Amino acid sequence: MQHLLSFVFLNLAGLCFSAAPPPTSAPIFSKPFVVIWNAPIYRCNQLQVPLDLDVFHAITTPQRVPNQVLTLMYYNRLGIFPYTDLYNFTQYNGGIPQKGNLNASLQKAQKEFDYYIPSSVPGLAVLDWEEWFPLFDRNADLREIYKALSINYTLQENPFLSSKEATLRAREDFEKAARRFMEETLKLGLSQRPNFLWGFYLFPDCYNYDFLNPNYTGKCPKSANVLNDKLQWLWERSTAFFPSAYMPVSVSKTQKAALFVRHKVLEAMRVAHLSQRPYSAPIYLYLQLLLRDQNGLYKDEVDLIRSIGESAALGAAGCVLWGSSYYFNDKESCKSLSAYLSNTLNKYVVNVTTAAELCSDLLCQGKGRCVRKNYDSDDYLHLNITNFKIQKIDGMFKVFGKPSITDLRAWAYTFTCQCYEDSKCRAQFGNI
């Protein structure tokens, strides 16, 4: 991608803001906001359906492919975590964290990390563990089995405990063991590949799924905030956060979509600031191209703005566009994807990533990331189509134009800067 941009000398007196958010870690990809592809495309390649993926910072797959910029470690590539099948109740590796073999798990994880992440270049390591949650009370519905098994195990070991005492002991033992598995696995990864950013997929979650509420605000329930506060140890160990905001069709094209994504990102930012580090860990939001549980129904530009655009405006470091091989497994679905990339997605990705980079360079002196002053506004980092043109030339998207003084004023009034670690920046325009 080529940016043919020229800039003007601008001195906007008075547009200097002091109320900036705490600093964040410097971007490992040298861009304030990136969009990463994380979906298998081998079937489309086999079917000789061309896919234009050049606009993405990295093209990765969730499959068993080593040496990727983003490595997604599913449960079967993540040591030997104990778990129980939620449908037939078969117990594996002990079934519950208390009965697991942590040393054996770490030995296997070390080999897997060595294989999948052989390089020392910077990247993202996403640990995808969804069988149980580390907080006892978060294991609801089908995951209630972990509570029952834990209580039974406690009573086997301590038969004279009352039911209440056994439940309290089971909660304590479960959470202690779950923490050890997750925390020690993170520590191992960080020690082996310190240039990678490590974190668990889905964490933190906002639990803002009450879409049927006519007064839906998107805000996390207070109970979610309280429980997330109990995972302080996880926020301290994580060097990146990977929350998920897969958009259901019921909120598509509505303001609820923006509110849903907004508070997912804001909760991740909140817990990031709980860490004792002098700067917050970056946030990479997991999204899907398709609306959740819909095969072939893609997000339109409005939904892209309220997902990718929302996360960029709030100060996320990037988005990961995840997809399953099930989505793109025949010629028709591959052609549909190809058309969607060419006609809708790619131009928007170029727009928002270019705008984020321009705002960072011009408002934050390239030393910080532009973030909304008012998180609950609908201000976005977009190029003004009056002054910019995005064209595809020789198969590559190119951006032509320059921001007007009006454009820059608009950014300055609606955005401030989150400086990178060990950098000094101020939300102001000076000599450009």
Q: What is the predicted function of each stretch?
A:
Residues I36, A166-L227, V261, Q276-R292:
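Aromatic-lined carbohydrate-recognition surfaces of secreted/lumenal glycan-active proteins
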